Amino acid sequence: MCPGGYVVSAASERGGVVTNGMSLSDRAGANANSGLLANVFPDDLPGDDVLAGVELQRRCERAAFAAGGGAYVAPAQLVGDFLAGTPSSAGGRVAPTYPRSVAWGSVEKCLPDYIVGTLRDALPRMGRQLHGFDVADAVLTGVETRSSSPVRVTRGADGQSVGVAGLWPVGEGAGYAGGIMSAATDGIMAARKVVEALGGGVAE
């Protein structure tokens, strides 16, 4: 969650739109922004290929590119319209911060139905816990598809890759974390495994 933050472009492939969030050090932006995440299980993926998660990611990113009309404009929808299943035609009190502009419409067209359903269920629940989180004219800007790795590098009980000795897959890129805190925690655990493998003791 980024207080006083901005939604930024994070695309790395031609023809795909990817969003992310950040704050500058003064956290003085007009908005707060937060990524909305949904579980994706192996049975949800389009096929059994090891890169099926990457394919799902690309489908969403390409759909967002098309929904934005090209030029890496991001699709956007008001929360109230999203919950009602209605495309948005204009913004409200909350101004979007995505730097390449937004195209008002329907972000749900960029996502699989099971993710849309999860988000529609979660937003009102979040609003009950965090007042204003589901306010009707809050802005959904899509899509954030890079919060977690779509693949996982398998590691053994010693923390090393099962295929390459001496390699410790760690954090988000290896598929073991989905954010700053979980990545830091995984890094600490991996560091302990490295010290143990090198014959050192680990203080508790």
Residue ranges and their predicted role:
Residues 173-198:
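A conserved FAD-binding loop/helix module that cradles the flavin
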Residues 88, 124, 128-132, 196-200:
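Generic secondary-structure signature for well-ordered alpha-helical cores
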Residues 1-106:
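An anion/pyrophosphate-binding glycine-rich loop and adjacent beta-alpha core
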Residues 102-177:
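A glycine-rich dinucleotide-binding beta-alpha-beta segment and adjacent secondary-structure elements
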Residues 79-82, 193-204:
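Active-site-proximal substrate-binding core of FAD-dependent oxidoreductases
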Residues 84, 89-99, 111, 115-118, ...:
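Catalytic cofactor-binding cores of redox enzymes
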Residues 66-71, 184, 198-202:
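Short C-terminal domain-edge/linker segments immediately following a structured domain
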